[in-house]
Swiss-Prot record:
One of the primary rRNA binding proteins, it binds directly to 16S rRNA where it nucleates assembly of the head domain of the 30S subunit. Is located at the subunit interface close to the decoding center, probably blocks exit of the E-site tRNA. It comes from the Bacteria. The lineage of its organism: Bacteria, Bacillati, Mycoplasmatota, Mycoplasmoidales, Mycoplasmoidaceae. One of its GO terms (biological process) is translation. Belongs to the universal ribosomal protein uS7 family. PROSITE patterns: RIBOSOMAL_S7. This is Small ribosomal subunit protein uS7. Pfam families: Ribosomal_S7. It comes from Ureaplasma parvum serovar 3 (strain ATCC 700970).
Length: 155
């Protein structure tokens, strides 16, 4: 067993927006280590966001992430041969990770032509409290509410 918990590594802020959250989005979008391609996708998507909304892209993106981040999630716990979905609070770090993961996942599943358009529209939708990523958050919260009776099984 470990003696100490490993230290969390901080990602560097991206050069254009000077934001760690944007760097995390770049890392979430990136496939096969192609960071340059991921950066160009995100910066182009942010340009589209600015054109469509007329607001700074970083502001819209931060609002989208805040809207998507879940407060409660379900964890499966086995008690006496039965599996229970136990609602648990989400740590701030995990909330951010889940928010970014859901935005990238549902952007990829959209039916626009390019990933740039898909990501831009998913960010705009999330900032307006609509879209698939918001629906995922609401479904998670609904399931947690339905399983509230098992909250005493928390560990």
């Amino acid at each position: 067993m470990r003696k100490l918990k490993p230290q969390k590594r901080q990602v560097l802020a991206d050069p254009v927006y000077n934001s760690r959250l944007v760097t995390k989005l770049i890392n979430a979008i990136m496939y096969d280590g192609k960071k340059g391609l991921a950066q160009s996708i995100i910066y182009s998507a942010f340009e589209i966001v600015e054109q469509k909304t007329g607001k700074p892209a970083l502001e819209v993106f931060n609002k989208a992430i805040d809207n998507v981040m879940p407060i409660i999630e379900l964890k499966v716990r086995r008690v006496g041969g039965s599996n229970f979905q136990v609602p648990t609070e989400v740590t701030p770090e995990r909330r951010q990770t889940l928010g970014l993961r859901w935005i990238t996942l549902y952007a990829r599943l959209r039916h626009e032509h390019t990933m740039i358009e898909k990501l831009a529209h998913e960010i705009i939708d999330a900032s307006n409290n609509v879209g698939a990523a918001i629906k995922k958050k609401e479904d998670t919260h609904k399931m947690a509410e339905a399983n509230k009776a098992f909250a005493h099984l928390r560990w």
